[in-house]
Amino acid sequence: MLSIRRHAKTVASSCTNLTQKRTYVDVYMKWKRDPYFDNIEHILRSSQLKSVVSLKNCIVQEPNRCIPISAISKKTRQFDVSTKIAHFLRKFPSIFEEFVGPEYNLPWFRLTPEATELDRQERVVYQTSADDLRDRLKKLILMSKDNVLPLSIVQGMKWYLGLPDDYLQFPDMNLDSSFRFVDMEDGVKGLAVDYNGGDKVLSVLQKNAMKKRRGEVSLEEIEFPLFPSKGCRLRVKIEDWLMEFQKLPYVSPYDDYSCLDPSSDIAEKRVVGFLHELLCLFVEHSAERKKLLCLKKHFGLPQKVHKAFERHPQIFYLSMKNKTCTAILREPYRDKASVETHPVLGVRKKYIQLMKNSELILKSRRNSFGFRDEGVVDKDLDLDFEG
């Protein structure tokens, strides 16, 4: 039977047995562009897809599954769209179909048959993967300081965790009895998980180490899998530091960390372990780096937590595409068997394919001189609603 030698989160005093020293090396490794990670399509299009799915959900919630542009034209911030809503919808004719409304010839939108079918498939995935999605949310909360997170944090992580937009609106259906809505300080509403100390929660790194060794694993045996970019060579000093870092005891993100010296090497390894586990929970195993900064207070992260990505480029990759910095966990892409594929990823890839089909449709329209599709409203008709 597999087991792992590690203190439970409820036993805070045991971590005092760890030797907490600080041998800080000012690691600076020149950022090296990696075309493979810069061109992972579902990461590149994730932000735009999020807006597409949010608008899709807004439309299907309507009684007739269609909506006038006037009802959503002022909600660019809600849907995280930087252009006019109508312009954004028209960019994806394979997903959103425009037609003349019942009154005043105003533009309305509904889903195309292809998008409607994909929406159905998406709902099936949510139903069949309900336990998986709930466990991912539970693990996120169990990594927090007191097993509780503000609802605003949970809401902000929904897309990354693969949860539906309305997930928290139906707690009786989506959450089990271990979840509780609580009042936090300053009147903030939170979501807590009651952990009874029964089955120990193991990180992906712990599970993989146990599988590899087929038995009990000590803390010193758990190392981070490294996946350097091609042509990347480290200076001897940095290589020596990295070897020593790997030998440090592993502190699971689900274990108590209150007695760790924040300036110790072990504390840094704990932060890297937290980021590794966090990205393992996410659909694309990636996230905009700035979106993770709000987690510092609730997960005991240092002020300069973003430096962890820079100090460990063989574990994480920072992509600068789309004028933003995206942190990507290398392991799931270089060793596909190491991390389970998120159940929602397949559906998102299908939405992205529809987005790509839209580009072909628009290109075909541009190439057809004088082409005008009947039923498509003149773009000027919605200007009054887009001001």
Swiss-Prot record:
One GO molecular-function entry: RNA binding
Any one GO biological process: Group II intron splicing
Transit peptide: 1-24
Keyword set includes Mitochondrion: yes
Knockout-associated phenotype: Severely stunted shoots and roots, small flowers with very small anthers and little pollen, and very small siliques containing only a few aborted seeds. Impaired splicing of rpl2 and ccmFC mRNAs. Absence of c-type cytochromes, complex III and cytochrome oxidase.
Cellular localisation: Mitochondrion
Stretches assigned to the PORR domain: 32-358
Short name of any one Pfam family annotated for the protein: PORR
The protein's name in its UniProt record: Protein WHAT'S THIS FACTOR 9, mitochondrial
Species this protein is from: Arabidopsis thaliana (Mouse-ear cress)
UniProt gene name: WTF9
